[in-house]
Amino acid sequence: NRYPLFLFATYMMYLISACLAGKPVRYDAKAYHYEAIQKLMRHQQVILACPEMLGGLACPRQPAEIIGGTAQDVLTGHAKVMTQQGEDVTQAFIIGAYKTLELAQQHQIKTAVLKENSPSCGRNFIYDGRFSATKRAGTGVTAALLLQHGFEVCSEEEFLARLTGL
């Protein structure tokens, strides 16, 4: 045999919302700290992304919600993402979603772990578009785009339950 034998350890790489990894990138500049995610980071199994910041929004920033439809409607131009003050931030959300998709593709990610309830990252729930703190079933813009392209998307709760076997 002329070819050397190489053994490769294969690790699952995850795309994770940066705010879940302790980065203060949420709209209110807060972050979450999950030890399980920190452990994955120490093992270099994580690509971090904040779609809203990738789309050019500042931190802190005004809260935003999907108005007039679903995340899929936002992606097709039939709904908007607006701040509570009435600023249209739809394009920033779309740009951030596509930049996040590009990262996932470049790094051959299979699973994205995104922040539930976010207008970008929500997997199962988002806020209802009336700034009333009421949640409704739905996905955020980035989550919808990743799902559309065949990526597994889960919320932090689903992911942490999977890691701990609950």
Where are these regions (language model features)?
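Short hydrophobic targeting helices and cationic amphipathic motifs
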Residues: 2-7
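Short, surface-exposed acidic-centric catalytic microdomains
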Residues: 32-82
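Short acidic/polar active-site loop segments enriched in Thr and Asp
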Residues: 110
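Short, well-ordered beta-to-alpha junction loops that form the rim of enzyme active sites
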Residues: 115-118
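Short Gly/Thr/Asp-enriched flexible loops that form oxyanion-binding sites at enzyme active sites
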Residues: 121-141
